[in-house]
Amino acid sequence: MFEISRTLNAALLSNEGSTETQWRQADLPQLQGWAEKGLLTQPKMIISNMEPQVTNGPNSATANGPSSNSRSCPSPMQTGGSNDDSKTNLIVNYLPQNMTQEEFRSLFGSIGEIESCKLVRDKITGQSLGYGFVNYIDPKDAEKAINTLNGLRLQTKTIKVSYARPSSASIRDANLYVSGLPKTMTQKELEQLFSQYGRIITSRILVDQVTGPTGGSRGVGFIRFDKRIEAEEAIKGLNGQKPSGAAEPITVKFANNPSQKTSQALLSQLYQSPNRRYPGPLHHQAQRFRLDNLLNMAYGVKRFSPITIDSMTSLVGMNIPGHTGTGWCIFVYNLSPDSDESVLWQLFGPFGAVNNVKVIRDFNTNKCKGFGFVTMTNYDEAAMAIASLNGYRLGDRVLQVSFKTNKTHKS
């Protein structure tokens, strides 16, 4: 399904001296053919991404992709590698779930000789986690791969290709959540506001429409810096300030970064309270929202503490809502009868790696029964998706989004 023409790729790479017009004339028909077969979409955008670019070097790192705390074998760069490795080792995010190891190798092998290539899979199920690593022999081939394949559209996914960075405490947890932004602020203006504090890896402004970037801003955005210290300076400088065009001060804080002490206290309080009640997915919306916020903080300790979730829950004899063998399962309620899996992909894809989606259908009509499930690889990304999409208006319906629990609707 994902077979890429080596002949075409070779032609693309040999045309570095060609003009933009010659490039488009030579390659657009083939790309359009791929689009007609469903292999690619937006061929003009792909060609644009295939044209030579100037990269930011090893620090143009990944963001919003699966973090190194996934249940998978880390790459050499994640466990600490040499400076030479940093120029040949790439991480590739947002791969289609049904892409195979062979297709992954074929795609990146068309650029140059590969030393190693790994599509990361769940150790239990063998299912792709939607990302992988490629290590080239020649640093120039790694740079070409970024220039050529970053932004390539495969099925419903736009893959992200960038240098893998060595694991270091200085670069972890540098993602910021920003709210109260002017509805007219663009992504470029958001970056301009924060760029004075350090190198920005990625940025995003949430919009109301799930079908594309044409919707109105929700006044909420995310900024990921290269280093945590830069993010800390941005919080000090901008939290509570009024940027140009803002009617009220903005809030700038780390995206889901609780302390271990607070997390353990909240977890104990939630699970050991004799008066604890679990509101259902359809009632007591405000109460459930507060409970979800506490749960989000409590379970976040998995990433930020060596204490595992299983060891914490053993203290109180409870299971973690939403946690499965393949990731974090999210319950989505109040979908319209015409909703299908593509709606869930579009909703949750921007927040991180999605393992799978499922819309529950009526056996007789094959229409959506009003709810579905999304499994995401990374806890932080799942929690951020819930925080952003719970209460989101989709058409004439307001979605209710939470981690799946034992009391959630069964299919």
Swiss-Prot record:
Effects seen without this gene: Reduced overall movement, decreased initiation of swim and turn movements and decreased mean body curvature change per swim half-cycle and mean number of swim half-cycles per swim. At 2 and 4 dpf, decreased axonal branches and at 4 dpf, decreased dendrites in motor neurons. Defects on motor neuron extensions persist at 26 dph. Decreased GAP43 mRNA levels.
Annotated SMART domains: RRM
Pfam families in the cross-refs: RRM_1
The UniProt record lists the keyword Glycosyltransferase: no
Residues in the signal sequence: none
GO cellular component: axon; cytoplasm; dendrite; growth cone; perikaryon; protein-containing complex; ribonucleoprotein complex
Tissue-by-tissue expression: Expressed in motor neurons.
Keyword Repeat (UniProt): yes
Highest taxon, organism lineage: Eukaryota
Keywords from the UniProt entry: Cell projection, Cytoplasm, mRNA processing, mRNA splicing, Repeat, RNA-binding
Domain (RRM) ranges: 88-166, 174-257, 328-406
Described function: RNA-binding protein that is involved in the post-transcriptional regulation of mRNAs. Plays a role in the regulation of mRNA stability, alternative splicing and translation. Binds to AU-rich element (ARE) sequences in the 3' untranslated region (3'UTR) of target mRNAs. Mainly plays a role in neuron-specific RNA processing. Required for the maturation of motor neuron axonal branches and dendrites.
Subunit-structure text: Interacts with smn1.
Protein family: Belongs to the RRM elav family.
Protein name (Swiss-Prot/TrEMBL): ELAV-like protein 4
